[in-house]
Amino acid sequence: AAGGAVEQHLPDRVGTEAHCPVPGRYAAHSVTPVAGTRVSEILGAAPLDVPTYHHQGVLADSLDHTAYRFSAWHADGTPEAMEDPGSRFRIAVQWHPEAGADARLFRALVASVP
């Protein structure tokens, strides 16, 4: 929707199945929020484990021409969250927050509604 491009199969670049290790089941991996972003305001700046199940991702250089910026990364260089800093709440994450116990993203979304 933002005009970015999709990396079709992450294991081809990263060499592991870390983002989708067991077919049909969520796993967890660590992401690190970028300081100064909405994601870091909501989740903190320290690395955190998130529920994951994906083999695709947004190409890291494909949003340079948009208002979006990446706001969390996996250690292998895969973008894990992006946001539009000019919007009230436009955040996209590559992980599955609905599959975990951490409701902070959902609470922040609800709180952003006027």
Outline where the language-model segments fall.
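Amide-donor transfer/coupling interface in amidating biosynthetic enzymes
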Residues: 11-114
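Catalytic nucleophile loop
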Residues: 1-5, 11
